[in-house]
Amino acid sequence: MYMSTDEVRNAFLKFFESKGHQIVDSSSLVPHNDPTLLFTNAGMNQFKDCFLGAEKRAYTRATTAQRCVRAGGKHNDLENVGFTARHHTFFEMLGNFSFGDYFKEDAIAFAWEFLTETLKLPKDRLLVTVYETDDEAFDIWNQKVGVPADRIIRIGDKKGGKQYESDNFWTMGDTGPCGPCTEIFYDHGEHIWGGRPGTPEEDGDRFIEIWNNVFMQFNRHADGTMEPLPKPSVDTGMGIERISAIMQGVHSNYEIDVFQKLIKATAEIVGCEDLSNQSLRVIADHIRSCSFLIADGVMPSNEGRGYVLRRIIRRAVRHGNKLGAQGVFFHKLVGVLAEVMGSAADELKKQQAVVEKVLRIEEENFGRTLERGMVILNEALDALEGKELDGETVFKLYDTYGFPADLTNDVARERDFTIDEAGFEKAMEEQRQRAREAGQFGTDYNAKIKVDAQSEFCGYTSTQERSDVVALFVEGEETATLSAGDKAIVILQETPFYAESGGQCGDSGVLKTESGLFQVEDTQKLGNAIAHHGVLVEGVLAKGDQVTAIVDAERRAAISLNHSATHLLHAALRQVLGEHVAQKGSLVKAENLRFDFSHLEAVTAAELKEVERLVNAQIRRNHTIETNIMDIESAKQKGAMALFGEKYDDEVRVLSMGDFSTELCGGIHASNTGDIGLFKITSEGGIAAGIRRIEAVTGEAALEAIDAQARKFEEKLQDAANKAKSLEKEIQQLKDKLASQASANLIDQVKEIAGVKVLVAKLDGADNKALRGMVDELKNQMGSGIIMLGNVADDKVGLIAGVTQDLTSKVKAGELVNMVAQQVGGKGGGRPDMAQAGGTDSSALPSALASVDAWIAERL
């Protein structure tokens, strides 16, 4: 029997719910607290701690339809996607799980019942495999379920492999829960090439694995040892795409309903008539992984999960380009995907606008260089004497044009070439080494200046210090002395001036000598030195002079308050929006603060209000802002967050505000959170795909912002009230005018029935009040007659009937309007000379009005 993919999903979940299982929502594609996984790649990932006995849940049986991604890391299907019938970057894994509840016998019985009774698969099309030494599973299949012994295949360890290295001994990764498994295969028929599992021809497509039942008995440690789990458990997985293909009578996963709708939509968008084109399959697969990854918080980037996402997007865009796509196209498939995925796309539907925007921007950015990069790649392939493209060219395409190596490999493979992967990796490592070497130096505020001096910062506890001048620079050149009016950089041996770092702007102030005054406008890092940028206002200043360095204490205090508020803001955002929020940049000034962070969509007014509430609550608690020096590992164990883009030494400063915020920070802060006074967000907006920016003020500036906002609201409210009154007056005048004009036009439609004037008309855009006015106007113009008017507004029918007094003995308006109303799903009534009604079936209005003439004729 045919079942849609959505029906298969629902049938599976309902079946196991009837067997006492708790239906658990799919977890995020980003594994929670599991650094061993790049992406969620199996249904059991979210239950890992349950299998280990480290987590107790309110249920011991669970069932899920888990979204999974396999692209990057150990489980990487990217290169095969689109070129085989069953490889995908994204798939759904149906699963049922037992946490120390039932074990092999029930698991096998459940699987067999669902397949043969719920889905009604022919038993003679199914065969099973068990681990070679798992006699218990063999006996259950054979003696209790009744599967013939010749349809049960024992699978041992791979030749030359390690113990337990078998298709029928499952591991999640190098570590974690594992155990023997039994797999169920479906026989697609003799007309398809392929052999039974365990034979040399097993890689054929005749016998397809549809369900894997893993019997979790061990926890595998990094050294390879197997520790028995506290209680044996069960983890099963069945790819929804494979079982849907069987239920829909097709062989390839790409022929099922979900993929066919995506393939057809893609073909229509890019203008491709050949629905069997492999590029259409690639795009249909990739829109699934990309959309759901973005919806789960992954953003395109050049590292980690973000880079895998970027690779998939760019691979899809390249295949669209190959099909002749004009302009951006990929993001247009998100809406189709949200529709075809049914109940699995609830969260995607909420995030649809954000997902579309991220994909569109990424495609636009890559599209600018794709065409040129393809020209260079094809020229390089044309010039090859052999069959391998060198690693340097592959690296150039990556470095200059953003071509991931696997995309280059795709193009090369299509032309029967390979790429030098080792050479590419060598070039990549050389680039990483150059970056490491460059990263050893501080920011060059002026690239021409090279300074060997080293400054010591002593400003955490002081804003004034005596110090010696160790270097002077004017226009990038070192000099021995400064004269009044010189714009220069002064390097001191010790300084209380904070150099810009971690988003906190540099200090300003003055350097005083007995004979001169240097105005410090900004402070920056210069190698290992601290550079005071400014102008010599009076006198002279020479290398070796002793100065009194005085920081602008009032400005410093304002900056420190805003910096502490930034930490509170960061923590509050993570509480309100989620732990996916990560700092992407900040700027802390005396006037205000700016904070950039990762988030997929605009922060709502309610969320901003809650963030403000949390921050101000911490301010009122007046936490002591504690600073502790510790090694980086201890800081991480304490849960300290590291700031975006910052490089830390082995010893770090850990800043804590109660138990609300703990961050690594080398900046200047207030003594207590209460010093901040008040916190007010002044703006929130997007600055890039998936990156939001909040600007805020504190203290007196926050009070001023609140007052200004209140005044602005009052002005807007008054303006709105005035405009509303004016518009209401204009609208009524227009309605009266339109009614009068319409009445004049309708007179031409008057006809006679048995010597009586009759007007029946349908008017669009007029409300009931206007219709009543028309009826009165028409009565006056006709002198004697019967009027029936109808209109449709907001898909609802409005009806008005009018009869002059001389005719009410024969025709009553209430009866007339009720006759028409009954035909449009309504009812009504009124006086003999005027009546009104309503209805719900707007499509029936024309035929209902057409029946009026005959009805009137019968009564005259």
From Swiss-Prot:
Q: Where is this region: Disordered?
A: 824-843
Task: List residues binding Zn(2+).
Answer: 563, 567, 665, 669
List its EC numbers. Answer: 6.1.1.7
For this chain, one GO molecular function annotation is: aminoacyl-tRNA deacylase activity
GO cellular-component term (any): cytosol
What reaction(s) does this enzyme catalyze?
Answer: tRNA(Ala) + L-alanine + ATP = L-alanyl-tRNA(Ala) + AMP + diphosphate
The UniProt keyword set, sorted, is: Aminoacyl-tRNA synthetase, ATP-binding, Cytoplasm, Ligase, Metal-binding, Nucleotide-binding, Protein biosynthesis, RNA-binding, tRNA-binding, Zinc
| Needed cofactors | Zn(2+)
Q: State the source organism's domain of life.
A: Bacteria
**Which protein family is named in the record?**
Belongs to the class-II aminoacyl-tRNA synthetase family.
| Pfam families per the UniProt record, alphabetical | DHHA1 (PF02272), tRNA-synt_2c (PF01411), tRNA_SAD (PF07973)
The name under which this protein is listed is Alanine--tRNA ligase
Q: What is its main location?
A: cytoplasm
Q: What does this protein do?
A: Catalyzes the attachment of alanine to tRNA(Ala) in a two-step reaction: alanine is first activated by ATP to form Ala-AMP and then transferred to the acceptor end of tRNA(Ala). Also edits incorrectly charged Ser-tRNA(Ala) and Gly-tRNA(Ala) via its editing domain.
SMART domains to which the protein is assigned, alphabetical? tRNA_SAD
